Amino acid sequence: MPLNFETDEQKKCYELLRADVENIVKETGYDELYGHKLTPDDQFYEEVIVDNLIYKFCRANQFEIEGAKSQLKKTLKWRKEFKPLHAAFSETHDSLLNDVCAITVSEENDPNQKVVSWNLYGLLVKHKEVFEDTDKFLRFRIGLMERGLQLLDFASEDNYLMTQVHDYNNVSMWRLDPAIKKCSKAIIEVFQDFYPETLFSKFFVNVPYVMTWLYEIVKRFVSEDTRKKFIVMSDGTQMKDYLKVLPKEYGGEATLNSSKLENIEPNAYVSYLLTQCGGEEPAETTAPEQEKETATA
């Protein structure tokens, strides 16, 4: 991810926040962000990754230092409490949810459209029971997001953002179940608050023209910069104008079910946290000496 600064003030904001990372980790008692270690005390630390992650928080806050610092702190505190890595790799979710949400990867797609998260809400509305427990649905949806983030390379120039597709085929244009609205609102707020600058574009597909409630709900909870990434279309096959590789349901060749990744493996640091620390990552945690020796051999 390129670090671009249009002014000296923007660069200063970044430098101030970058220099304060270790203090923020100590204050929050949590040393993990999107599956990566923030402090340089063992082999899991990758400086260029942390550089780029911190830049995201600056950019998301228009390079205003207090806003960027506050959001980073809140994000780490939330991750410590919510345990999104557990939701992604340790918890078992409703099989129905796994059938209507998917992640695909294609190196043939344009930069930052290689990793795509698919959410088929038109199928979900037939099973309203999955939305009755907001927390349960949220943990599934956040887990899906975290697995997608594992497929990104924050140090690259062409794969440091995700693309999302929300398919509303067969969703009623006149009314939406209150439980679905509640879940949608909760997910939008979490992504806005704790996943800044992780999205390249979001497609709303198979949306009837008169279905204005969709955009009205979403725009209330996201920033102007985020809204600019939204693409709304009435026909899913219109996506061929944006993505080179598509599932058959959207004008491509292979079906979404056959294209989706079934097993996404966590990186070494995430595996360490889940197995050695039980998902908890205090500020002073370091890897075992044996692992350090292996890594430096």
From Swiss-Prot:
UniProt xrefs under Pfam families? CRAL_TRIO, CRAL_TRIO_N
Q: Report the function annotation for this chain.
A: Non-classical phosphatidylinositol (PtdIns) transfer protein (PITP), which exhibits PtdIns-binding/transfer activity in the absence of detectable PtdCho-binding/transfer activity. Regulates PtdIns(4,5)P2 homeostasis at the plasma membrane. Heme-binding protein that may play a role in organic oxidant-induced stress responses.
Native species: Kluyveromyces lactis (strain ATCC 8585 / CBS 2359 / DSM 70799 / NBRC 1267 / NRRL Y-1140 / WM37) (Yeast)
Membrane topology recorded in Swiss-Prot or TrEMBL: Peripheral membrane protein
Give the UniProt keywords, A-Z. Cytoplasm, Endoplasmic reticulum, Heme, Iron, Lipid transport, Membrane, Metal-binding, Microsome, Transport
Q: GO CC terms on record?
A: cortical endoplasmic reticulum; cytosol; endoplasmic reticulum membrane; plasma membrane
Q: Which cofactor is recorded for it?
A: heme b
Predominant subcellular localization, coarse grouping: cytoplasm
Q: What is this protein called?
A: Phosphatidylinositol transfer protein SFH5
The UniProt entry's sequence similarity note says: Belongs to the SFH5 family.
Task: Indicate where this protein resides in the cell.
Answer: Cytoplasm; Endoplasmic reticulum membrane; Microsome membrane
Its UniProt entry gives the catalysed reaction(s) as: a 1,2-diacyl-sn-glycero-3-phospho-(1D-myo-inositol)(in) = a 1,2-diacyl-sn-glycero-3-phospho-(1D-myo-inositol)(out)
Q: Which GO molecular-function terms appear in the entry?
A: metal ion binding; phosphatidylinositol transfer activity
SUPFAM superfamilies named in the record: CRAL/TRIO domain, CRAL/TRIO N-terminal domain
What the entry lists under SMART domains is as follows: SEC14
